[in-house]
Amino acid sequence: MAAGPLRGLAVAGGGESSDSEDDGWEIGYLDRKSQKLKGPLPVEERQETFKKALTTGNISLVEELLDSGISVDTSFQYGWTSLMYAASVSNVELVRVLLDRGANASFDKDKQTVLITACSARGSEEKILKCIELLLSRNADPNVACRRLMTPIMYAARDGHPQVVALLVAHGAEVNTQDENGYTALTWAARQGHKNVVLKLLELGANKMIQTKDGKTPSEIAKRNKHLEIFNFLSLTLNPLEGKLHQLTKEESICKLLRTDSDKEKDHIFSSYTAFGDLEIFLHGLGLEHMTDLLKEREITLRHLLTMRKDELAKNGITSRDQQKIMAALKELEVEEIKFGELPEVAKLEISGDEFLNFLLKLNKQCGHLITAVQNIITELPVNSHKIVLEWASPRNFTSVCEELVSNVEDLSEEVCKLKDLIQKLQNERENDPTHIPLMEEVSTWNSRILKRTAITVCGFGFLLFICKLAFQRK
């Protein structure tokens, strides 16, 4: 193999920042035109030549230098070994040669292992997978964490590699371990928006209810990062995928998870997981994948499916068993309606503090659902406006309704602010009353927090409706 220039620098895997990002690997050419060593070299020059042979991928020269006596685990500047560098650029052949020459697959520098470096490499999943297979075959531990307590499976999930995730689990990687911030592999996949990895982790037994240190579940992390498909999928209580592959033996897992279609092109061997749309994600979560073709044939979208009644489902050829699954899921997704008639009359002074607080919590929750619905429309409308049949009604009608909504939300916001001021006034009067016994600080703080949150939510909903109105006006 001819020597060539280095195209990029090797950086520490896992996003760890340090003053050693180049790790002593300089851009340049081999000084010697020949791939053969013409004679013995001094130790320092021999190490420099070894480093340049690694950066250019000159395997024949690497082997010759190893034959001349240089150690395969030679540490270069900042402590990286030749195997760590080869893994960081997903050079499969170089990794194989170094391992065959006795390189330590379990080496780590400041808890940065070779396996972590390989999992966080910038390369195709095919090359990364092959490098990791080689390292695991030499007993690299898939559960050793870095300084931030991130394990290899977390890096693979973060970077969107479902096949790598599956391989690591098949070799004993813990699915639900947490890093220093409480993130699991599933949390990382949800945060980055990798749907295929999320589905694979759920099959492998990932627990979607594990919370981060700030109390967020993977679904909430997905929502915060605007990955609404993943949020909707993870929000479903029913999860037929969970643990589907968990009881398989190691050999069965590897065989099942890495099986590919031999008729596919080589470049697509490791891309067997296609991107799912909204409808596919919903059906997959309910174990109703077999309905996908039927619904697409009848041109039934997810939004249409979510509005269908039981008799409509039956007319479209959906079996009673599948109907039950769909109706149960729809019930979970319904926005809880506030029954204002059940609220005791304030004028009769029969309302309790708990009932009033419960009312505010329900109101706040419903506003949150409405905000999410409007956000979905704002997200989809500019990109998929061709899917909305505007011919059914004039766009001016939509704008007019939006204006009324904004006006109503402004009125609601004004009334909530009045309510907040009134409660604050009553609270101040009670505190100044010498006969009043003050409540615990935590209770008043919590009530105040609920009121503030409700007011902010209502104001935010009004702002979103205003943006929605502008979007319709542009159309």
Curated annotation (Swiss-Prot):
Domain SAM stretches: 272-334
One of the Pfam families matching this protein, by short name: SAM_2
Key words of the record: ANK repeat, Cytoplasm, Developmental protein, Differentiation, Meiosis, Phosphoprotein, Repeat, RNA-mediated gene silencing, Spermatogenesis
Biological-process GO terms, alphabetical: cell differentiation; male meiotic nuclear division; regulatory ncRNA-mediated gene silencing; spermatogenesis; transposable element silencing
An example Gene Ontology CC term for this record: pi-body
Repeat (ANK) residue spans along the chain: 45-74, 78-107, 110-144, 148-177, 181-210, 214-243
Residues modified to Phosphoserine: 17-18, 20
SMART domains (alphabetical): ANK
Subcellular location: Cytoplasm
Top-rank lineage group of the source organism: Eukaryota
Segments for region (Disordered): 1-25
SUPFAM superfamilies according to UniProt: Ankyrin repeat, Pseudo ankyrin repeat-like, SAM/Pointed domain
PANTHER family: ANKYRIN REPEAT, SAM AND BASIC LEUCINE ZIPPER DOMAIN-CONTAINING PROTEIN 1
Assembly and oligomerization: Interacts with DDX4, PIWIL1, RANBP9 and TDRD1.
Function: Plays a central role during spermatogenesis by repressing transposable elements and preventing their mobilization, which is essential for the germline integrity. Acts via the piRNA metabolic process, which mediates the repression of transposable elements during meiosis by forming complexes composed of piRNAs and Piwi proteins and governs the methylation and subsequent repression of transposons. Its association with pi-bodies suggests a participation in the primary piRNAs metabolic process.
Protein name: Ankyrin repeat, SAM and basic leucine zipper domain-containing protein 1
Name of the encoding gene: ASZ1
